[in-house]
Amino acid sequence: MKRDKLYEDILRPLLFTLEPEDAHELVHGMMRRFGGMLATFPYRYTGTDLRTNVAGTVFDNPVGLAAGFDKNADLIGVLRHVGFGFAEVGSITARASQGNPRPRLFRLAEDQALINRLGLNGEGAAAVAKRLSSIHASLPIAVNIAKTHDPAIAGDAAVEDILTSFRAIKHLDLSYVALNVSCPNTREGCMKERQELSIILSEMQKLNERGLPLFVKISPDSSDELIYDVVQVATECRLSGYICGNTTVTRDGLTTHANKLAEIGAGGLSGPPLTKLALSTCKKIAGLKAPAQNVIAVGGIRSGADAYRFIRAGASAIELYTGLIFVGPSLPKLICDELSELLRHDGITLEQAIGADLK
């Protein structure tokens, strides 16, 4: 795959002189202020061969922005200029939160990976919903919902907390809404009880008068038993699909020195070290899901070849985050270019490629 020389040789070295979260905030600010200029760069894939239908919405291409990058929907007016086919905003929570104390975002340059323990920081569901309703999105938008980062919110209060967020956004024109049950960076962790998940999803569907497609986000660290339970509940509750997956709490296969990892401490790992685990989880979910359900894959994807492997494993679309940090803003188009070439080489369409390795 080609390189983004401007980013890798000039911009990335400058950004990497800053603390990771400071660099992220600088990039956000520049995109908000000068995002219109991105339209003059050759970042968009203009072919029609990569269009894909996910839960009733047609994406121009299957490469999306993963939740976590644009937590508060600040960038939805410019993301199309960077080549994305869709974007997932959030995670949003019912209440605004500062998240965990800094430092909470760390680069593993040797592994081209990140560790984060941001802790669901964000402006809150009401503020994000207001912004989404007032700005014209340049591409299909989804929203990721999580429980507010507060261990005191549990049981019925946790259900109501999630429903509060859903009520705030359910009137919006969204391609889907994802329930995040997989955040590793809060003290209470993720929802693991089948009954708890069933109650939450059932209550969301009761409020879902407009029939917004609902997805559930599953951790790549999930056991086979948990994956089976989540898929069963999601099918019973008439969900449209799955986001597979999130960061991992494991540290397998890293070249970063153990002393540095110990110094960093807890957090979710993202980037290429996660790819094998995420691909395995994708295959498991795709093999269990109902035929009408979709899988959107995320986890260490940074090339068209990576995307192709996930698509052949059952994903209808893929999402990026960490790859953007290390490869640059041209990554969505670079992936689309290579993916299109791989499909032509194999003589199949994108639709035919979805789940090809499961047949």
Question: Which residues fall in each region the model found?
Answer:
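Glycine/Thr-rich beta-alpha phosphate-binding loop at enzyme active sites
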Residues: 28, 32-45, 181-196, 233-291
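Glycine-rich beta-to-alpha transition loops that act as phosphate-gripper elements at the mouths
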Residues: 67-70, 144-147, 218-224, 294-305
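Catalytic cores of alpha/beta
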Residues: 72-81, 222-236, 286-287, 291, ...
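Glycine-rich phosphate-binding active-site loops on the catalytic face of alpha/beta enzymes
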Residues: 83-97, 183, 241-251, 300-301, ...
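A gly/proline- and charged-residue-enriched helix-loop-helix capping module
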Residues: 90-140
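Active-site-adjacent beta->alpha loops and helix N-cap segments on the catalytic face
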Residues: 95-104, 125-126, 133-134, 185-210, ...
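C-terminal helical cap(s) of enzyme catalytic domains, especially alpha/beta-barrels
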Residues: 99-112, 252-267, 324-348
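Active-site glycine- and acidic-residue-rich loops that bind
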Residues: 149-163, 190, 216-236
